[in-house]
Amino acid sequence: MASDAPPTSMLQPEERNYSQVVFSRVEQSYVPGIDIICYFTYTSGFHPAKKDWVGIFKVSWKTTREYYTWVSADCEEQGLEKRVTFKAYYLPKESDDYYQFCYVDQKGEVRGVSIPFQLCRKIQDEGEEDILLVTTEEEAQGMKEKQRVLEEKVAALEKDKCTLQDECTQLALEQKNKAALIESLQAQQLECAKKNEELDQQNQELERQLEEEKCKNGSLHLKVVSAEEERERVQNDIRSLQLEQNQLKEENMELHKHTNDMEFSLKKYSEEAKNQEEEVQELKDKLWDAEAKHHLLQVQLQDIQMEKKKDKYSIELLTKEAEKVADLRQNLEKKDKTMETMEKQLAQLQRENATVLRQMEDLSYTLELRKAEISDMQQQRVRDGAEIEHLNRLLTEQSSSTPRNQGLFFQNPYESESLISFANEPQPGEAPGGSSVRHVQMQCPECGSEFENFQVFQDHIFCHDLESTE
């Protein structure tokens, strides 16, 4: 017996498969401590495998995992009847339980079941010496209960026996039908053999005629070979054109994707330029406010200087009047302090104005850089559009040269000129941070109208699209 576990299944077996292996010469009981030989026969529709096995199962088992012991069903018996031997060491102990042989295939499915048997000593015959048994009332009651259980088991076994007998009758009938079918098939085989001989003769005659036709059609064969070679060459050309066409399609898709990325970047830079223009406008407003405050302070400073001059003139005229001079000096000191405070405020405002001017210069320079980047991207988009148009022409030419493979035409979405143009570009030698702020000029390709607001320009283009669809 092999040391590893046999193939089993957790599923409950189907009883319709139990008749594929038939057990024979099964005793009603076997003596414990002695090897048991199990005999079985395969039916004509069953094909055994090397991993098939025979096991001893306790009656009322549910799955093939509940075996008590097992041996491999692979044996070298030449006859129809096979046999395997269960060693006494692995057999169940003596008891009143019933067991049965089961044949299990390599998938863990039951293919044959034997009648039940017991492992117990044989009961002595009536002619043997009688033995006087003295039992108590409890033992007698237990024996009666045990006898009742045995009678129930015997009744169940009788029922199983009737079922098995019916199955055997059905199997015998099936075997008889199969024998008749075999005889019919043998007769058909003889008839087929005769027809096969006739067909062989016809085949020989046809082969002779075929040889004659081959001799006659030698030149045609050469033409067919030449045509096949030409067809193969054309197919190779078509395959190479298809590969080239697929490559061009992939390049076209890559360019299309790159163009979409550039459009997204262009839109992003346009939004940034618009935001920076708004920041520049805010800084201009702040600068105008600061200049207004600066002008007001200058006017106030001029008034104070005029008053200071008047006070000095009054001091020169009223040097003789001590009290007036003292009062005037006190007023002059107060006004001097006020003037120093206002001069400090003016210096602070001048520093703030310088900072704002530097920020405006930086933003103007950044805006000019953004405009240059957008112009470069527009030029790149025009170049990509021309390249896509060139690829489309190549695809159209290849599609027209291959009639069985219709090519795809990819329309260039960037054939028209760029809709956005930037006016007032910085002239050579002009600093990016000039005093004037340049505005983005957008021109409509349909009617030639110019716009400074990007949203108004988009709405105008959308109106043209609606008119064209109507």
UniProtKB/Swiss-Prot annotation:
Q: Give GO terms: molecular function aspect only.
A: zinc ion binding
Q: How does it sit in the membrane?
A: Peripheral membrane protein
- Subcellular location field: Cytoplasm, Perinuclear region; Cytoplasm, Cytoskeleton; Cytoplasmic vesicle, Autophagosome membrane
> Which residue ranges does the UniProt annotation give for the motif CLIR?
131-134
A GO BP term here is: positive regulation of autophagosome maturation
Q: What does this protein do?
A: Xenophagy-specific receptor required for autophagy-mediated intracellular bacteria degradation. Acts as an effector protein of galectin-sensed membrane damage that restricts the proliferation of infecting pathogens upon entry into the cytosol by targeting galectin-associated bacteria for autophagy. Initially orchestrates bacteria targeting to autophagosomes and subsequently ensures pathogen degradation by regulating pathogen-containing autophagosome maturation. May play a role in ruffle formation and actin cytoskeleton organization and seems to negatively regulate constitutive secretion.
Q: Where is this motif: LIR-like?
A: 201-204
Taxonomic lineage is: Eukaryota, Metazoa, Chordata, Craniata, Vertebrata
Q: Which residues bind Zn(2+)?
A: C444, C447, H460, H464
Q: Indicate yes or no for the key word Coiled coil.
A: yes
Question: Which family is annotated?
Answer: Belongs to the CALCOCO family.
A GO CC term assigned to this protein in UniProt: cytoskeleton
Task: Name the chain's protein.
Answer: Calcium-binding and coiled-coil domain-containing protein 2
